[in-house]
Structure formats: C-alpha cells, structure tokens
Design a protein with these regions (language model features):
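Structured C-terminal cap/extension of enzyme domains
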Residues: 37-182
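Glycine/proline-rich, positively charged
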Residues: 1-37, 43-50, 55-58
Length: 182
C-alpha cells in the first residue's frame, strides 16, 4: 500500500504510522531540508520513496542534473514527468549511461537553486478550481515558464486570454487556503 500527497504533515504521519510501503511526494533538486527529512524518514522506516515532480513541473530543464541528483538517494525512485519524445529519449539513454554527479552538474543545480528556490508554484493544481476561472497553477508560474520552457503555447492568443483572466481575481484567497505549500 502506498500514499501520495503534497502536504508535509500528512507525509510525516504516513511515515510514522507504519501502514505504508511507499510514500509518493514531490522531490527534486529544488527540495529543501523538510523534503530531505522525508527521504531520511522513509529510509529509517524501510519505506520506499517515489519522487514525483522530479523536474519541478517543467522548471528544471537539465535532465542529467535531475537524474544525477535523484540517484544520490538510496530508496528514492523518481517519476519523470516526460512531456516530449526528446525528453523520453534522454531518460532512456540514461539506462545504459546514467549521469553521475560532478562539478558541472553541481553548477547547474546551484544556478537553478539560486533562481528557483523559495516560494514558487509547483504546479500541483490543488489550488483549483478558481471561482473566477483563473488557471492559477499556470498563471502563478508564468514568468518562470516563459524563461525555462518553450513559450509558444503561453504566448498564443489562448494563453494570453488565460492570463487576462487574472484581472478578474476575486481576492477570495481560496487558492491560498488550498495550497499545500502555504
């Protein structure tokens, strides 16, 4: 039996309960000490750890760095959110030639951590639905998505129309109340 969630308190309860064989939780090289503690807790309780959002919803663009980071943790099995065939080919190539952590990949990780760590939307969608029809999980990450992923979809008339809905925000804070990251 496994459990999946995005809330630290629930994850700790699951580990402490002894009822589960695995925990599925967001974990990438943007993870903080709280997520690292979950990995350690699972290892101590002989639980597997399934790392979802290993590419942080598309914000991490260097798959070799992501793979090398995850490979450092015994008992962690990542789920790669592959969106393009090119990405699938990259991960398939790692079966025979897995990336190992080195200074070059550490530099990539350090750069991304400096740019992305802290308060950012992970794109989980727990904030949805919005009573004003705002696609919060994409709108909240738009500045990062424009810099770090192909931008054609975001800059299309449809993408711009979705962003325009922000002007109709009701400021009801339902999204904040539902966000598992605070």
């Amino acid at each position: 039996i496994s459990i999946t969630n995005h809330r630290l308190a629930v994850a700790h309860e699951a580990i402490d309960s002894g009822l589960y064989e695995t925990l599925q939780f967001p974990f990438s090289y943007l993870a903080g000490e709280q997520e690292m503690a979950l990995v350690r807790g699972c290892r101590e309780k002989n639980m597997g750890f399934i790392a979802m959002k290993g590419l942080s919803g598309g914000l991490i663009t260097n798959s070799a760095a992501a793979y090398a980071f995850e490979a450092q943790y015994d008992g962690v099995l990542p789920i790669w959110g592959v969106q393009r065939e090119k990405e699938l080919d990259e991960f398939l190539s790692y079966i025979d030639n897995p990336p190992r952590m080195n200074e070059e990949l550490k530099a990539v990780i350090d750069h991304d951590r400096a740019e992305l760590c802290g308060e950012f939307c992970r794109g989980c969608g727990y904030c949805m639905p919005c009573p004003a029809g705002i696609e919060i999980n994409n709108c909240a990450r738009m500045s990062l998505l424009l810099r770090r992923s192909p931008s054609a979809a975001q800059l299309s008339p449809e993408g711009q129309a979705k962003m325009k809905k922000i002007e109709g925000c009701l400021h009801c804070n339902q999204c904040k109340a539902k966000c598992p990251y605070g």
